[in-house]
């Protein structure tokens, strides 16, 4: 089967959880998978040595992590030579109305344009509100942001909005792009 690199940037942990789930799904399908945090990738990492690459990042304050930008900038030639995909995690992606998700899509499009990367697939992924992990100030700010957006504001619990079935379908579609991938029925 194929060798696949999953690189990610995560500020609060949900993107890391998603990247690990992607890695597990690919491994369960028989692929050789390496999952790395894009902030501190191994010095010898060469995405061009993989049969496919998935990169993920989360949106905060209107952009993805700058180190993910740097990772993609550095490796965009290799990323454009192999099957590749990008997933972007945000609370905006949790909105059921496509018009409400548009700001997140625009951030993805700007990111891809600025980095010169042309992935075969992209996906907006709903993130999580982890009130229990926030300090007081961040908890208050996130509660206010969530409230304005019609989201969950009970800070006594956490909320996960990630659609795992949608993510699995995204990974399955990516897998079909890999060399020696079985044909989809």
Language model feature labels by segment:
Residues 1-82, 172-185:
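N-terminal beta1-alpha1-beta2 submodule of the flavodoxin-like/Rossmannoid cofactor-binding fold
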Residues 57-185:
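FMN-binding flavodoxin-like domain, especially the glycine-rich phosphate-binding loop
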């Amino acid at each position: 089967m194929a060798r696949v690199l999953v690189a990610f940037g995560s500020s609060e942990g949900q993107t890391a959880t998603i990247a690990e789930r992607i890695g597990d799904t690919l491994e369960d399908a028989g692929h050789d998978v390496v999952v790395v945090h894009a902030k501190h990738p191994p010095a010898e990492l060469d995405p061009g040595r993989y049969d496919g690459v998935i990169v993920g990042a989360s949106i905060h304050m209107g952009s993805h992590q700058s180190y993910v930008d740097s990772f993609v900038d550095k490796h965009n030639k290799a990323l454009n030579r192999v099957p590749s995909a990008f997933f972007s995690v945000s609370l905006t992606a949790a909105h059921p109305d496509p018009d409400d998700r548009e700001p997140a899509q625009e951030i993805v499009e700007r990111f891809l344009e600025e980095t010169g990367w042309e992935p075969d697939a992209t996906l907006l992924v709903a993130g999580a509100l982890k009130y229990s992990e926030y300090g007081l100030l961040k908890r208050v700010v996130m509660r206010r942001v969530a409230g304005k957006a019609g989201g969950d504001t009970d800070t006594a619990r956490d909320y996960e909005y990630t659609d795992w079935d949608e993510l699995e379908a995204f990974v399955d579609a990516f897998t079909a792009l890999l060399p020696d991938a079985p044909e989809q029925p």
